Amino acid sequence: MEKQVDILIIGAGISGIGLAVHLSKKCPQRKFEILERRDSFGGTWDLFRYPGIRSDSDMSTFGFNFKPWAKDKVLASGAEIKGYLSDVISENQLKDKIHFGHRVLSANYDSTKKKWLVEIEDNNKKKQIWSANFVMGCT
């Protein structure tokens, strides 16, 4: 099955989620989807869960301009950042745009079609080819 999108975002961490929000607000006519290899969003903030993990950057600069950090503590823990990203996903209706358990096997530009052809494998080992005008690596 081939799925077609304008923009394919690879990665549902802070960069991929931020890009998705900006696209939905500034380019609502563009169709985009997010591929995430793991079973959850958050990237680093989901992957690493050791005691004491936190951002070394204050959240007033690390957070998004469209959703200012509202807590008093400016150096957020990993769990707090993951919660912040969860709020961003909910508030911007991004949940249905994220495809968890989808791994990119290859991405090749077809100059005849003027499209990226991206081979994807899901957790069930089912392979698909998606086409996109743009592929944004947010990993």
Per-segment meaning from a language model:
Residues 2-5, 131-133:
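Active-site acidic short loop of glycosyltransferases
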Residues 3-34:
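N-terminal Rossmann-like FAD-binding beta1-loop-alpha1 element of flavoenzymes
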Residues 15, 39-40, 105:
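Short, solvent-exposed loop/turn segments at secondary-structure junctions
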Residues 34-43, 131, 137-139:
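Carboxylate/His-rich catalytic cores and anion/metal-binding grooves
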Residues 37-87:
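Glycine-rich active-site loop/strand segments that organize a redox cofactor
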Residues 71-139:
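Feature captures the FAD/FMN-dependent oxidoreductase FAD-binding
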